[in-house]
């Protein structure tokens, strides 16, 4: 009993050093030295060199000249609620919850008022609340509005959308998605 | 829809290709044969053994083994509880987080030491980098290793060998299996875009001028052991749906396969260690078929979407509530079935927002516990079901039941029943108590039948040591933290103790020579009967909950 206790204490200490100190330190050093962009959160900058976000994290867009993101239960970790740690979260509404239906009815109305034909991903809120993507169909639904607001030739806008669409992995796994932030940043930088 | 099922088929093919490789490797490790890691691992192991005061590795008796497992888990749990309670004074706390409430810290420590990783908190707002990497990340290795060690001891006992030395198997599981794979996997995840930094959250001004706080941290090394060790506790609140935990479909593929590869591989390991690979493969395919059926149910449900919302859309669209665009309906459904089946508990989409078939399947996974099953323990439960089936079929034909040439007697059946019965006890009794006080205790966030699922799911997840949840539930309360802790402990340690005594007892029995009347367990017929026994026993116990929860909700939606 006592012997077991002593062995447990000593092995806990040694395994802790191995798995909670040495192992993370190795990954941290490799990350910071070899892959600093990814290791620090894939932060991207605008034309002035100002950090405007992360290529992997979505943002809220409301202006006519931007593509809009999906609904987020946490407002894309923006504003006072997110300070200082940053947050993530989902609605966790059940399919049978009346709140889901009324929220989606309101969202569909808002989109239709702005001449956007609702797609599933634009009505349903995302899992992380930070989803950087919309479906290609959702981008097409907003095409005319953005083209008009920015007076951008349709071919140019289409090629920008294509450029910022991430396809399936190996052409098979997952669903294609248009990265809203990098697309909007590219629109600003034209 | 076809494209979706092609994705599922390919991922399952990858699993079938990789799990036996790992299974064979694990068998080599625990049979003491040489592997290509010897040169690096052996000096490291000698150092750990010498430093821990383990000079020889005699096989332990059941009592000795159990006390070693329980005491070491207790020491680790207390150590982590103390780190969590004093995190405010410890380093790597860039956002100045204070200590959590004692009951939350207690629940967290128990949840991680039991390989469950049920989280009544959001990582980014509650625990410091030191607590996450130094306390929780540590338990992710040791709790998974404890599970593997117990499974190996169980396999040894069943096949008539001495059960082995707990500390030796614990250390070998880490140095030979968990740590090497994690190191490679963490680097792959880094390349894919998962951060690994000690810098605090990035504060940025968005394109529209709002202020956004982007949580970061040492995620990559944490993420891979989270999946590999079937731990499932996210660095961030929203787990593997978070783009920093699971940024793209390369990462998602890696994480999906790696969470299943050890429990699937351990079945093959068993076949090799028992000298009967055929039996291993039969069980493998039995689980595979059950798994495939459950995937199909969940995936079709998500694909057909929510009828109420489809009316607004004017067409049938998949249910995307709580899902990420990049994963879509199919990879979220596959993940949901895999994570609840394997007791990983990580999520890449919200289970609370799954359609009723998805809720049905995830709950069924938690009730059955053998659709691959928990790290190590799942494989052991499979054999408990085999033993019970031998007993049932033996009764039918009036023979003394035997398994692997050893008689199944009263002691074995008592211990197997205990393993089987502790699960409903740890789920149904607290569920009943909690549902009796819906306003004060339950914290239900979704009305109607779904609320019953929320409460049952939380205890099922705790008792099965899974850790996923119907996360709308307001569960960071004194009641939930303490009552879920009861289910966590009962669901983990009662079966472990019973498994070890069962295995040790089997190992000490005189082998019975095989005769013409011996019931062979390595046949398709017997495996089919086992599958039937698993489903009937599971259904008899838990059908009322499934009917009151997801089934009723499904009828309500039409």
From Swiss-Prot, chain A:
HAMAP family: KdpC. This is Potassium-transporting ATPase KdpC subunit. It is found in: Cell inner membrane. Part of the high-affinity ATP-driven potassium transport (or Kdp) system, which catalyzes the hydrolysis of ATP coupled with the electrogenic transport of potassium into the cytoplasm. This subunit acts as a catalytic chaperone that increases the ATP-binding affinity of the ATP-hydrolyzing subunit KdpB by the formation of a transient KdpB/KdpC/ATP ternary complex. The system is composed of three essential subunits: KdpA, KdpB and KdpC. One of its GO terms (molecular function) is P-type potassium transmembrane transporter activity. The chain crosses the membrane at residues 15-35. The keyword Repeat does not apply. The gene is kdpC. It comes from Synechocystis sp. (strain ATCC 27184 / PCC 6803 / Kazusa). Signal peptide: none annotated. GO terms for cellular component: plasma membrane. Belongs to the KdpC family. It is a single-pass membrane protein. It holds the Pfam family KdpC. GO terms for biological process: potassium ion transmembrane transport.
Swiss-Prot record, chain B:
The keyword Transmembrane helix applies. One of its GO terms (cellular component) is plasma membrane. One of its GO terms (biological process) is potassium ion transmembrane transport. One of its GO terms (molecular function) is P-type potassium transmembrane transporter activity. Signal peptide: none annotated. The chain crosses the membrane at residues 2-22, 66-86, 135-155, 177-197, 253-273, 280-300, 327-347, 354-374, 378-398, 413-433, 482-502, 528-548. It is a multi-pass membrane protein. The keyword Transport applies. It is found in: Cell inner membrane. InterPro entries: KdpA (IPR004623). It comes from the Bacteria. Keywords: Cell inner membrane, Cell membrane, Ion transport, Membrane, Potassium, Potassium transport, Transmembrane, Transmembrane helix, Transport. Pfam families: KdpA. Belongs to the KdpA family. HAMAP family: KdpA. The system is composed of three essential subunits: KdpA, KdpB and KdpC. Part of the high-affinity ATP-driven potassium transport (or Kdp) system, which catalyzes the hydrolysis of ATP coupled with the electrogenic transport of potassium into the cytoplasm. This subunit binds the periplasmic potassium ions and delivers the ions to the membrane domain of KdpB through an intramembrane tunnel. This is Potassium-transporting ATPase potassium-binding subunit. It comes from Synechocystis sp. (strain ATCC 27184 / PCC 6803 / Kazusa). The gene is kdpA.
């Amino acid at each position: 009993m006592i012997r077991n206790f002593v062995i447990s204490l000593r092995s806990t200490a040694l395994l802790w050093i191995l798995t909670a100190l040495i192992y993370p330190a190795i990954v941290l050093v490799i990350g910071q030295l070899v892959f600093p962009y990814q290791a620090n959160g894939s932060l991207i900058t605008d034309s002035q060199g100002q950090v405007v976000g992360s290529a992997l994290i979505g943002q809220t867009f409301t202006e006519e000249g931007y593509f809009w993101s999906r609904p987020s239960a946490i407002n894309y970790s923006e504003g006072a609620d997110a300070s200082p740690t940053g947050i993530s979260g989902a609605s966790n509404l059940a399919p049978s919850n009346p709140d889901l239906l009324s929220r989606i009815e309101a969202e569909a109305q808002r989109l239709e008022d702005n001449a956007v034909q609702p797609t599933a991903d634009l009505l349903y809120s995302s899992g992380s609340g930070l989803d950087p993507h919309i479906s290609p169909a959702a981008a097409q639904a907003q095409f005319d509005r953005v083209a008009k607001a920015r007076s951008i030739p349709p071919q140019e806008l289409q090629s920008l959308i294509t450029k910022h669409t991430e396809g399936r992995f190996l052409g098979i796994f997952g669903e294609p998605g248009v990265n809203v932030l990098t697309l909007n940043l590219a629109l600003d930088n034209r | 829809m076809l494209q979706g099922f092609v994705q599922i088929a390919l991922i399952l093919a990858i699993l079938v290709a990789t799990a036996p490789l790992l299974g064979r490797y694990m068998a080599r490790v625990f049979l003491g044969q040489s592997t290509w890691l010897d040169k690096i691992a052996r000096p490291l192991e000698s150092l750990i053994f010498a430093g821990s005061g383990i000079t020889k590795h005699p096989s332990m008796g059941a009592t000795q083994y159990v006390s070693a497992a329980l005491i070491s888990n207790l020491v680790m749990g207390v150590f982590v509880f103390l780190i969590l309670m004093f995190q405010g004074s410890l380093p790597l706390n860039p956002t100045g987080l204070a200590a959590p409430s004692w009951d939350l810290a207690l629940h967290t420590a128990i949840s991680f030491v039991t390989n469950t990783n049920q989280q009544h908190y959001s990582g980014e707002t509650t625990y410091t980098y030191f607590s996450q990497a130094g306390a929780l990340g540590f338990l992710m290795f040791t709790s998974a290793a404890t599970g593997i060690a117990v499974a190996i001891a169980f396999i040894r006992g069943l096949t008539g060998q001495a059960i082995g030395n707990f500390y030796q198997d614990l250390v070998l599981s880490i140095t030979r299996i968990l740590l090497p794979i994690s190191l490679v996997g963490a680097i792959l995840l880094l390349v894919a875009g998962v951060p690994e930094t000690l810098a605090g959250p990035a504060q940025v001004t968005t394109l529209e001028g709002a202020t956004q706080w982007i949580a970061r941290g040492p995620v990559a090394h944490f993420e891979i052991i989270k999946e590999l060790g079937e731990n499932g506790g996210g660095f961030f609140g929203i787990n593997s749906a978070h783009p920093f935990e699971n940024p793209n479909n390369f990462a998602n593929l890696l994480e999906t396969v790696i969470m299943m590869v050890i429990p699937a591989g351990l079945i093959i390991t068993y076949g090799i260690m028992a000298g009967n690979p055929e039996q291993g493969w039969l069980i493998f395919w039995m689980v595979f078929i059950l798994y495939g059926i459950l995937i199909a149910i969940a995936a079709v449900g998500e694909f057909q979407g929510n009828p109420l919302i489809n009316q607004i859309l004017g067409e049938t669209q998949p249910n995307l509530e709580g899902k990420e665009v990049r994963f879509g309906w199919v990879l979220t459904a596959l993940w949901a079935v895999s994570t609840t089946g394997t007791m990983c508990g990580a999520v890449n989409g919200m289970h609370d927002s799954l359609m009723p078939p998805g809720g049905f399947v995830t709950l069924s996974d938690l009730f059955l516990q053998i659709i691959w099953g928990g790290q190590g323990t799942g494989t052991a439960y499979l054999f408990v079901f085999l033993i019970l089936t031998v007993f049932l079929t033996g009764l039918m034909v009036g023979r003394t039941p035997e398994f692997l040439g050893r008689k199944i007697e009263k002691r074995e059946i008592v211990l197997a029943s205990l393993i089987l019965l502790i699960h409903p006890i740890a789920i149904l009794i607290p569920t009943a108590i909690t549902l009796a006080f819906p306003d004060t205790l339950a914290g239900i966030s979704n009305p109607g039948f779904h609320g019953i699922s929320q409460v049952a799911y939380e205890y099922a997840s705790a008792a099965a040591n899974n850790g996923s949840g119907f996360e709308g539930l307001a569960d960071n309360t004194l009641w939930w933290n303490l009552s879920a802790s009861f289910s966590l402990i009962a669901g983990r340690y009662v079966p472990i103790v019973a498994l070890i005594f069962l295995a040790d007892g089997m190992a000490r029995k005189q082998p019975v020579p095989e005769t013409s009347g011996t019931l062979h367990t390595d046949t398709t017929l017997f495996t089919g009967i086992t599958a039937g026994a698993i489903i009937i026993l599971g259904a008899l116990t838990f059908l009322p909950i499934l009917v009151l929860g997801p089934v009723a909700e499904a009828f309500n939606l039409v």
